[in-house]
UniProtKB/Swiss-Prot annotation:
<keyword id="KW-1133">Transmembrane helix</keyword>
<feature type="compositionally biased region" description="Acidic residues">
    <location>
        <begin position="199"/>
        <end position="210"/>
    </location>
</feature>
<feature type="compositionally biased region" description="Basic residues">
    <location>
        <begin position="101"/>
        <end position="112"/>
    </location>
</feature>
<feature type="compositionally biased region" description="Basic and acidic residues">
    <location>
        <begin position="211"/>
        <end position="230"/>
    </location>
</feature>
<feature type="transmembrane region" description="Helical">
    <location>
        <begin position="7"/>
        <end position="23"/>
    </location>
</feature>
<feature type="compositionally biased region" description="Basic and acidic residues">
    <location>
        <begin position="113"/>
        <end position="173"/>
    </location>
</feature>
<feature type="compositionally biased region" description="Low complexity">
    <location>
        <begin position="50"/>
        <end position="59"/>
    </location>
</feature>
<keyword id="KW-0472">Membrane</keyword>
<feature type="compositionally biased region" description="Basic and acidic residues">
    <location>
        <begin position="60"/>
        <end position="83"/>
    </location>
</feature>
<dbReference type="GO" id="GO:0016020">
    <property type="term" value="C:membrane"/>
</dbReference>
<protein>
    <recommendedName>
        <fullName>Uncharacterized protein AH6.3</fullName>
    </recommendedName>
</protein>
<feature type="region of interest" description="Disordered">
    <location>
        <begin position="27"/>
        <end position="230"/>
    </location>
</feature>
<keyword id="KW-0812">Transmembrane</keyword>
Length: 230
C-alpha cells in the first residue's frame, strides 16, 4: 500500500509541474482599447501566400522538456523510483506465503496419516493373503469337496445299518440254549456227565443212562435197609 501511495503522489506532482511550465511559455495576447484603434487605422493582415505556414506538431511532441538541473524534477524521479526497503518487505511478505502453503499441505498429510492409522487399529485383523503358490487350484478344491461328501455318506450308511441291527435285536426274541435239566413230565433222569465211549466216539443214549440210574437206585435202597436194621 505504501508503494502505491508513493506512485500516486509522484504522478500528481509531475502533472502539476508540466502544467506550470506550459503556462509560462504561453504569452498573453495584447488587448487594444476601443478608443485608440479605429477601423481606418486597423492593420491589414498579410496574405496567406506570403506567410510560411508551419506544420502542426503532434500532441506527444507538445510536452515541455524537463530540465535536469531543476530540483523538482529530481524529486519526481526519486519518487518514481521504488524504495529498496519497500521492495525487500514485499519480497519477505511473499516468501512466508509460500512457506505457509507448504506447512498447510504438510499438516493435511499428517492428519490423513493419523486418520488412516486410527481406522486400521479399529478394523479387525484380516489374515494375510495367500501367495499364488499357496492358493489351491479349482480342481483340487472340487476333489476335496467330493471326498468330504463321500465320507459323510459312508458315515450315514453306517449309522443306518447300526440302527437296523438294533431294531432287529429288539423285535426277535433271544433263543435260549436247551437246558439239560429234567422236565416235570419226563421219567428219564438228567444227563449230568456225558461220557464219550472210545469205540463209537459218541454220547451214550438215554436208555443206557436210565439203566445205570436204576442200578444205582437199587444199591442205595439196599444200603438204606441195612442201615435201618442195624
Amino acid at each position: 500500500m505504501d508503494y502505491i501511495q508513493m506512485l500516486f503522489t509522484a504522478s500528481i506532482l509531475s502533472l502539476g509541474y508540466l502544467v506550470f511550465i506550459c503556462g509560462k511559455k504561453k504569452k498573453p495576447k495584447p488587448t487594444a482599447s476601443t478608443e485608440s484603434v479605429s477601423p481606418l487605422n486597423e492593420p491589414k493582415p498579410p496574405p496567406q501566400s506570403a506567410v510560411p505556414q508551419k506544420p502542426a506538431a503532434p500532441a506527444a511532441e507538445e510536452k515541455a522538456p524537463v530540465d535536469p538541473k531543476d530540483p523538482k524534477s529530481k524529486d519526481v524521479d526519486e519518487a518514481k523510483k521504488p524504495d529498496p526497503a519497500n521492495s525487500k518487505k514485499s519480497n519477505k511478505s511473499k516468501k512466508p506465503e509460500k512457506g505457509s502453503k507448504k506447512s498447510k499441505k504438510s499438516e493435511k498429510s499428517k492428519k490423513k496419516k493419523t486418520e488412516e492409522k486410527v481406522m486400521s487399529e479399529d478394523k479387525p485383523e484380516r489374515p494375510d493373503k495367500l501367495t499364488e503358490e499357496e492358493k489351491p487350484d479349482a480342481k483340487e478344491k472340487k476333489e476335496i469337496e467330493k471326498e468330504k461328501t463321500k465320507e459323510k455318506e459312508k458315515t450315514k450308511e453306517k449309522e443306518k445299518t447300526q440302527e437296523k441291527e438294533k431294531s432287529k435285536d429288539e423285535t426277535v426274541p433271544k433263543q435260549h440254549a436247551p437246558s439239560l435239566k429234567r422236565q416235570e413230565g419226563d421219567k428219564n433222569p438228567e444227563i449230568t456227565n456225558p461220557i464219550v465211549t472210545p469205540e463209537t466216539d459218541e454220547f451214550p443214549t438215554i436208555d443206557e443212562d436210565a439203566e445205570k440210574t436204576k442200578k444205582t437206585e437199587k444199591k442205595d435202597v439196599k444200603t438204606e435197609g441195612t442201615l435201618k436194621k442195624n
